[in-house]
From Swiss-Prot:
Pathway: Cofactor biosynthesis; coenzyme A biosynthesis; CoA from (R)-pantothenate: step 5/5. The gene is coaE. Belongs to the CoaE family. Catalyzes the phosphorylation of the 3'-hydroxyl group of dephosphocoenzyme A to form coenzyme A. GO terms for biological process: coenzyme A biosynthetic process. It comes from Francisella tularensis subsp. tularensis (strain SCHU S4 / Schu 4). The keyword ATP-binding applies. ATP binds at A16, S17, G18, K19, S20, T21. GO terms for cellular component: cytoplasm. This is Dephospho-CoA kinase. It holds the Pfam family CoaE.
Amino acid sequence: MNFINTYPIGITGGIASGKSTATRILKEKLNLNVVCADTISREITKKPSVIKKIAEKFGDEIVMNKQINRAMLRAIITESKEAKKWLEDYLHPVINKEIKKQVKESDTVMTIVDIPLLGPYNFRHYDYLKKVIVIKADLETRIRRLMERDGKNRQQAVAFINLQISDKEREKIADFVIDNTELTNQELESKLITTINEITNLTN
């Protein structure tokens, strides 16, 4: 799929890698439109038809006040890779359709597509992305960030990280990799500016 008005760039990274900070910098400092898969997912899971399907899979107790209990759902997919795969396989097509729609409507020269779960196993569905930026950080840094940011203990932090694919897997689809282990936000911003400039030069 080709987009006439914009150049879609994927960004991904594991939990607590600093990917969200990088995305915010691209939006606020570089004035690029951002399409966020997580935001789209939250909106989609508010739809009655989707709520019904998820309840059929995981039980009516997953619904609270006519909405998906996201904390309960998160706990289920943390404990079960099968449940996580089912949820991703079910939600993926409709999320991807909305991502494409929003990218098509974007009015900036480049559009950042924030997809936390992007990897070799599903990249064929996102082959419209012209470049992919991977944000990574070493394991101990990510564990520390999760413990400080979310109040998790070490075991919980490791469990969350292990649910996701490894940085090594992510790097298989990367055009650019930024190691955010020890970067300040200002240093991260500088790296991102350099990366976007490189992409701009490649497209000219």
